[in-house]
Amino acid sequence: MENTILHIHSFQLPQTEQPYPEAMLFDRDTSDSRTVLTQKPNGLEISLNFLQYDGHKGLFIRQDSRTNEPEYIEPKVLKPRNSYILFRNATSRCSQSIDPNSAFVSRVSSYIWGSGIPNPIVRRWFKYMGFFEALYHEVDYPEYIPNKLPKSPKKPKVQKGATKSKKKGAKGKNKVTALQVLVGPTVGVGGRMTVSPMTAFFSNNSHVTCYDPNFVLDTPTREFLMMPLDDITLPSQGPRSDSQEQHVPRQPPDGQDYFDILDIDDFVSPYDDLTTRSFTNRQLFKHATLG
């Protein structure tokens, strides 16, 4: 499963001036298309449709192949905190999605291993973020699911005159991170995980960083800012305090709606007033939240 991108979504999006369905995802290949997730009658699978979206009417547009006339479709809003795992092959454009609340979870393990992402890491993160209990009954190796993320390993003491070991890949070896994401000129595996409104995680097994859940991984080779897992703060639930400083992110370069290489100042707190602000699919957020 090369060139596979793993998406885990909670579908909690902010209120905007225009209707903004919770089930809407951005398709990274066409600027005016959206990936709509609709639940099948059996409640176990999700189907994918690529449709245009009319922001003024709040409806999706599907072109009728027989009459060539547009058909307006009202989006199905999924329940808050519903989470779905979507495996997408970037080469063949084929997609498969699985509801972790169903028995299909057992299949997820093989897909995760096949894409080079160690499933115990994903399971730990699911457990830590408090997702549905049904998920844990379906996975293999329940001993891999701790109640919380383990502490980072202590740094070994170095005696005077001794030289530190510089083994490649040793950094962050024992850390538990959201997903293993490999970004580089020859690597085609990417990942994204949303665990709460306006929060997403990327990880390369030793670092993790947060993005808006609408943010799309444009190419597997794009360079992203990575922050150590210890630098990610998990604030307690609740609204942002008025005494806290309001952070205003800088804007990307003229003519771009994204940053080529991200800077720490490109992140804002999710505790800004999400009900009155309008967000784009390129805005980023600094802190993880338990949602």
Swiss-Prot record:
Composition-biased stretches (Basic residues): 151-173
Function: Mating type proteins are sequence specific DNA-binding proteins that act as master switches in yeast differentiation by controlling gene expression in a cell type-specific fashion. Transcriptional activator that induces the transcription of A cell-specific genes. Required for repression of conjugation in diploid cells.
Protein name (database record): Mating-type protein A2
DNA-binding residues: 73-144
Location(s), subcellular: Nucleus
GO MF assignments: DNA binding
Keywords: Activator, DNA-binding, Nucleus, Transcription, Transcription regulation
Main localization category: nucleus
One annotated Gene Ontology cellular component of this protein: nucleus
Region of interest (Disordered), ranges: 148-173, 232-255
Protein family: Belongs to the MATA2 family.
